[in-house]
Structure formats: C-alpha cells, structure tokens
C-alpha cells in the first residue's frame, strides 16, 4: 500500500502465508525509481524492528508510524524492471548479493515478478552462497495472485507518477 508520508513512490509490502497471515515472513518498503536512461528500478528497503509494523497493510496508524529512519536499503536487492505488453516484469539485480537469512541460514535471493492490470506472479528462491544450491522457496513455480482491490486512490497527486 502507498505510504504517502514517505518519499514519493514508497509502497508497503507484507508477505505472509495464509495460515499465519498475522505474522508476515517479510515486510518491506519498495520504492520505484526512474533512471536517467529511461529504465526503471525498484529499491528494496528492510524495516528496522519489523514486528512493530506487522499488520500495517490493514492498519493506517501502523503505516503512518513508519518513518524514513526505520528503513535500511538492502544492498544487492534492487529489482531491475522492464515494461511488457501486459504490464511490467522484474528481477533482482545480478550478482547473487541479495542476502537473506532464513531459518537461521544465510542464502542469496533470486526473485522475479510479473505485474499486470489483473494480478501478479512472483517467485522467490534462496540459494546457498557457497554451493549455489537451492535451499528454500517455491518448487512448483511462481505464486499467482489475482487483483482483488486497488489502492490507487491512496496515491498522492504530488508523486507525479505519470
């Protein structure tokens, strides 16, 4: 969801399994940025002490309490984005530097997404940084999500996204 009190383009992302929806395994702030060459990237920010903001997708007061000081840019985790006929697709920058600690083990993230007017698909997989072997994530392919709500009316005009 948009975080209009932060820098333009700031979006709150919570990822949780349906059976533990109140305890997200990932909460981030994503911030798209147009580059001088016309390309688009999405900067990926961790949130310090993230449990404070769990449920922020549905709780306006929690969203409002997120401040720039709470954010830490995740080095190596920027998404490189391309426009497609259906919308956009992106993947984490190359180099195996987007490090993620999962179940007490370090891994590097390989992540891709496709975004359209009707939904999105995403796949996240972790790999061992020493062996490059798969250690976590989807085995059966991308997760597919249908769009059920729009928060476009929460995007402030001053963001000038068009």
Which residues does each predicted region cover?
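Short N-terminal edge-element motif at the start of the domain
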Residues: 1-25
């Amino acid at each position: 969801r948009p975080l209009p009190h932060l820098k333009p383009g700031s979006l709150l992302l919570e990822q949780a399994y349906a059976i533990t929806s109140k305890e997200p395994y990932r909460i981030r702030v994503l911030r798209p940025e147009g580059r001088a060459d016309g390309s688009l990237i999405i900067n990926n920010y961790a949130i310090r002490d993230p449990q404070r903001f769990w449920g922020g997708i549905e709780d306006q007061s929690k969203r409002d309490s997120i401040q720039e000081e709470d954010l830490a840019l995740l080095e190596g985790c920027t998404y490189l984005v391309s426009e497609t006929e259906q919308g956009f697709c992106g993947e984490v920058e190359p180099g195996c530097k987007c490090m993620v600690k999962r179940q007490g083990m370090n891994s590097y993230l390989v992540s891709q997404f496709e975004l359209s007017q009707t939904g999105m698909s995403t796949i996240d997989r972790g790999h061992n940084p020493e062996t490059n072997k798969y250690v976590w994530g989807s085995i059966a392919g991308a997760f597919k999500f249908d769009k059920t709500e729009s928060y476009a009316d929460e995007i402030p005009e001053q963001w000038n996204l068009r």
